[in-house]
């Protein structure tokens, strides 16, 4: 049986004391020392993977326009993309950022852009921008998913901890106090990024300003059309069966079931997400600030925001 670490304990999930083993400490030190080598390795390998992705998108375009699953990181968009890919006759390109200022250049650069948005690095970014936006004026179907900003922030901080936020202490994190981890989260993460994404990515790319146009909060999904873009926006918290139904109505065909994908617990440092989630119960001011963001105000009605507040404070 797995033993759960008490929220205020500095001990790791799998036994041990409050101090990490020497081997764990050394590996964190080596991670920092290895940064320049990782950067060089990435510079050599990334273009090859990018070229492979560019060929794949060209092949998809030759068969017909793929659906662009375009959503911020850690919003459950992988589950939507997987369902569409399992649907006969449908192919997808999944990407989180299409604006170059949000492309992360690697471990020697900042993970936060000048506009306050979280950056990301993926082989689909430049290929999708070039082939689906710059080199084409054909109609394009787009799916985006919105996730509550508190869940978004905790999930991104822990899932990408090894790459960005906790890179220098990722292996030691299970031994660190919850208070220390939460303070680091508060001090380093771009907390408004999930809301900024809708302005600096989605609106910039599609011309659709969901904050101005509004959202069907009780239903949890809405279709937007502007020029060549036909967009379906889903809220992550609605039932997966409702997501499937909305996609089927939008595409006018049956869609494979939407199922959970890309779970956070396989990437985050053990126990850290759960401890930060527990610590959030004592942070009503933070919760209120996140629920006051334009994205939360647009995608959730007052009753839904109250329910979210109660959930995070439980």
Language-model segment annotations:
Residues 5-314:
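Membrane-interface amphipathic segments in extracytoplasmic regions
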